[in-house]
Each structure stands twice: as structure tokens, then as C-alpha cells.
Amino acid sequence: MKDHQKIILVGDGAVGSSYAFACVNLSIGQEFGIIDIDKDRTIGDAMDLSHAVPFSTPKKIYSANYSDCHDADLVVVTAGTAQKPGETRLDLVNRNIKIMKGIVDEVMASGFDGIFLIASNPVDILTYATWKFSGLPKERVIGSGTSLDTARFRMSIADYLKVDARNVHGYILGEHGDTQFPAWSHTTVGGLPITEWINEDEQGAMDTIFVSVRDAAYEIINKKGATFYGVAAALARITKAILNNENAILPLSVYLDGHYGMNDIYIGAPAVVNRQGVRHIVEMNLNDKEKEQMKNSADTLKKVLDDAMKQID
């Protein structure tokens, strides 16, 4: 990739605009183009965001067209219909997979040869679809996966134990949705297994923590209509890792090819990411219960994915 860091955002709704604002505040990227079906909104947002630039570092922000994707390092997609109260993320697939195909076709027609970062839900399925539609190498098509779920997980444990969330290490794996699960066998706090921090009679509290993490989006949607700050921050973190060639380990929706006993699926797992995309997938030694949970999550996604792709074929 060139030294000049160029990001194109497709989808200027609540998630997209929050992500753009995060990138400005965190000094991520040097050029930031915004695409949306509502052109006036992108013009207004570009103006508004540019007024925040003097408080950060220099950055060119503008209302973009798909032709501007041709030399982008990263295209971030947050477009799609939103999850409504009572809907699961998987319920969105029929509406959003067609939208995604239209977006990917337009981006690829520009000559784009960078990295796709997908946040639209259901993210695991739409990331797989983007890989298929684009023809890009699997390493350069990435989904936000369980990055937000993992952040919620670490924060909830930290609140319970009254420690800094940055000292909690553990991952939510699987679908970014109802079949996700915590890898308790690899969760540590300050270098010690989580079991060293809790008594046997506190296991119920840990189970409650996970349920609150899994269902957090539903609660937020019921109260304010949508979630956007958390996922925007997660996208900004992933963007920073890619553009700055960090080789950071982040829980993302990545393509499994034999990893965890899975094939031909995008699903949430820790991966090393840099400016080439996914460099390596971290295959954790899960216990038997976690292996079964991973299989269940993958099976659920596969069924929905197969049905969704038939609509396009």
C-alpha cells in the first residue's frame, strides 16, 4: 500500500457517521470519502466532519462517488437496512444481501484492489457474500465479527471484578449474533485464568454476564432504536490496525479453511491483521463444550448463508 492512507465509507447512517467521527478524532487515515444513497447527507457530513479536523490532524474529507474507490486502501461498508426491535441479525439477510451485491459491484467496477471491511448485518454472511461477489483474496475481505461483543465481554467482566478492562483478555467467538459464545477456557485477568478470580458459586454471575453481552444490542435497540457508538469504535480500531500495519490480534469475521474444523465460512475468531489484511488466524485450543458451540454457530450460519446465496445465483 502507498503511504497516503485513503478510506472510503459506504453507508452514512448512524454507524457510518459515528465511524467517520471516530476516525477524525483518532487521527486515522489522511483521506476520507463518504458514499451514500442520500448524496446531500454525505455533503453535509463531510462539511461537518471537516470542521472537527482542526482539533485533530490534517485530513481530506469529502462526499465521494464509487469511482473514488479505485485507489482506496480500505472500503468500509456500513450500509443496509437496520435491525428492528424483535428482529435478529439473521432476519436482515434477505434485505441486505441484495444491497451488498449492488455495492460490491460498483466498488469493483472502479478498479478497487484494496481491503473490504464489512460491518453491515448479518456481518458474517455479508462478509462471505462480499468475498464471493468481489473475487478478492479471502485475506482482503474482513468483517467486524465479534470485535464489539468481545469489548462488551471484557468490559462486563471488568465491572464485575472491579479491574481495568484493558487487563481482561478473552474472546467472544462464532456468529456476531445469537449463537456466539465466550471462550471461558482462554479468558484471563491480569495473566490469571478467570477461575482464579471467582468462586464456584459465582459461576452463575459469569453466565449472567455473557447473556447480557449477547443480548446487549437488543436492549439498546429497544431503548434508543439502534447501536452505533460501540461498533463505530470497533471499526476504527480495526482500521487503525490495518492502515498502520500493526499485526494486531483482533476478533474478526474471517474465512476459515480448516481452522477449528470448519471450511468455507466466515465466522468470528481472533486473527492477526496488518496492511495486507488477515495475516494469520489464531486457532485457540477450545474445550469440548466450546468446540460444540463453535460447530453450532457455524451450522446456523451455513444454513442461512446457503439460502441467501441462492437468491443471488
UniProtKB/Swiss-Prot annotation:
Cellular component GO terms, alphabetical: cytoplasm
Swiss-Prot/TrEMBL GO biological process terms: glycolytic process; lactate metabolic process
EC primary class: oxidoreductase
UniProt EC number: 1.1.1.27
Pathway(s) it belongs to: Fermentation; pyruvate fermentation to lactate; (S)-lactate from pyruvate: step 1/1
Record-annotated active site: H176 (proton acceptor)
UniProt GO molecular function: L-lactate dehydrogenase activity
The entry's keywords: Allosteric enzyme, Cytoplasm, NAD, Oxidoreductase, Phosphoprotein
Subcellular localization(s) per the UniProt record: Cytoplasm
InterPro entries: L-lactate/malate_DH, L-lactate_DH, L-lactate_DH_AS, Lactate/malate_DH_C, Lactate/malate_DH_N, Lactate_DH/Glyco_Ohase_4_C, NAD(P)-bd_dom_sf
Main location class: cytoplasm
Regulation affecting activity: Allosterically activated by fructose 1,6-bisphosphate (FBP).
Family, as annotated: Belongs to the LDH/MDH superfamily. LDH family.
Name the UniProt record assigns to this protein: L-lactate dehydrogenase 1
Originating species: Listeria innocua serovar 6a (strain ATCC BAA-680 / CLIP 11262)
